[in-house]
Amino acid sequence: MSLTADPPACTVPAAGVSSTHKLVNGGAEKIVFKIKSSNNNEYRIAPVFGFVDPSGSKDVVITRTAGAPKEDKLVVHFASAPADATDAQAAFVAVAPAGTVTIPMSATA
């Protein structure tokens, strides 16, 4: 089971903008994920919970609101999804995370 982010980092202007990234499942199992941010005041993430099909990808939109330039990060926690799962948030609570992917975020002036 493997999950990667493309692009692997996010650099945005501190004045605010959105950036789209793909979570790519390189394995043969469906993955459930949850995204945590080190800065919930200036970043919005959609979706926070989700599934990535085997050999598939899922778009994640990172939106930066206006604020002071600084370094932050997103951490994507992931695990194999239960076979019958349809609700990502409920499924994620029911499994133990198997790995993480860190996406460094940089807001520049």
UniProtKB/Swiss-Prot annotation:
Any coiled-coil regions, as ranges: none
Pfam name, any one: Motile_Sperm
MSP domain: residues covered: 1-109
Species annotation: Caenorhabditis elegans
Subunit structure of this chain's protein: Monomer.
Tissue: Expressed at higher level in testis.
PROSITE patterns assigned to the protein according to its UniProt record, in alphabetical order: MSP
GO molecular function, one term: protein homodimerization activity
Designated name of the protein: Sperm-specific class P protein 19
